[in-house]
């Protein structure tokens, strides 16, 4: 592997481990990417030493171009980008403001969608960023395919619209953000809302959106709290 971007590689590796610790993907499925420039991104790759999402290290994170070729000499020796690299590439192409894409397979998100339970703003101060995210709508890409080529990725991006997240029916979740941290934390919020929705349904209840006046009263606690403190907690809780 070529040198460079040590801190960025570690951040992507930490993000993969956080996703696994939060149950967003089992085993070795799922990947996180970080835009480096207009043509290249860091992404968790497949290789002879990978051990699964929960044990991702910086050595699993490699620099590639948008076509999956090495982003620097020696970068992919013995490694290959994930099959769903086009998913990451097309989300980043369509969103100049996005720096990171997370693709995971959260069981609760898949189950809630298949049960007909949309991701709705059913909570308030329990998760303020999550409530606001859900209030804006969480769209669904209605195909359970492996998003392994540009055509399928463009379909998913079209379903995503202008929203930062999209549920992939029978498959998982794609989340984007202005940072790796934001993209992962958004995925955690969607998963949390899906889990709550399933618990409500199991108890015989029905989803009810937070009243509009309560939603409007929720403050923006700022990135220092919503992202900074939240991310330090996610990394620390892994031990």
UniProtKB/Swiss-Prot annotation:
Cofactor: a divalent metal cation
InterPro entries the record matches: Aldolase_class_II_sugar_metab, Aldolase_II/adducin_N, Aldolase_II/adducin_N_sf
Superkingdom of origin: Bacteria
Active site: residue positions: 84
GO biological process: pentose catabolic process
Top enzyme class: lyase
Reaction catalysed by this enzyme: 3,4-dihydroxyphthalate + H(+) = 3,4-dihydroxybenzoate + CO2
Signal peptide: none
GO molecular function annotations of the record: aldehyde-lyase activity; metal ion binding
Binding site for a divalent metal cation: 84, 103, 105, 171
Gene3D superfamilies associated with the record: Class II aldolase/adducin N-terminal domain
Biological pathway: Xenobiotic degradation; phthalate degradation
SMART domains associated with the record: Aldolase_II (SM01007)
Listed EC numbers: 4.1.1.69
UniProt entry keywords in alphabetical sequence: Lyase, Metal-binding, Plasmid
Gene Ontology CC terms: cytosol
Family: Belongs to the aldolase class II family.
PANTHER family listed in its UniProt record: 3-OXO-TETRONATE 4-PHOSPHATE DECARBOXYLASE-RELATED, FUCULOSE PHOSPHATE ALDOLASE
Function summary: Catalyzes the decarboxylation of 3,4-dihydroxyphthalate to protocatechuate (3,4-dihydroxybenzoate) during phthalate metabolism.
Protein name: 3,4-dihydroxyphthalate decarboxylase
Gene: phtC
């Amino acid at each position: 592997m070529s040198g460079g971007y040590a801190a960025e590689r570690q951040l992507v590796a930490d993000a993969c481990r956080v996703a696994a610790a939060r149950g967003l993907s089992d085993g070795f499925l799922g990947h996180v990417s970080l835009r480096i420039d207009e043509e290249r991104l860091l992404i968790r790759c497949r290789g002879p030493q990978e051990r699964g999402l929960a044990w991702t290290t910086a050595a699993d994170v490699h620099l590639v171009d948008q076509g999956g070729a090495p982003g620097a000499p020696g970068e992919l020796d013995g490694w290959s980008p994930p099959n769903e690299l086009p998913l990451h590439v097309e989300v980043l192409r369509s969103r100049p403001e996005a720096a990171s894409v997370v693709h995971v397979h959260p069981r609760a998100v898949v189950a809630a969608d298949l049960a007909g339970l949309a991701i709705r703003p059913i909570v308030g101060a329990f998760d303020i960023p999550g409530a606001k995210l859900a209030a804006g709508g969480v769209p669904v890409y209605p195909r359970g395919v492996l998003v392994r080529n540009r055509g399928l990725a463009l379909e998913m991006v079209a379903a995503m619209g202008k929203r930062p997240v999209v549920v992939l029916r029978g498959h998982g979740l794609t989340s984007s953000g202005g940072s790796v941290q934001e993209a992962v934390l958004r995925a955690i919020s969607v998963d949390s809302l899906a889990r709550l929705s399933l618990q409500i349904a199991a108890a015989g209840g029905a989803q009810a959106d937070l009243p509009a006046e309560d939603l409007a009263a929720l403050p923006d606690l700022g990135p220092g709290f919503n992202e900074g403190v939240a991310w330090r907690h996610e990394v620390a809780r892994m031990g």
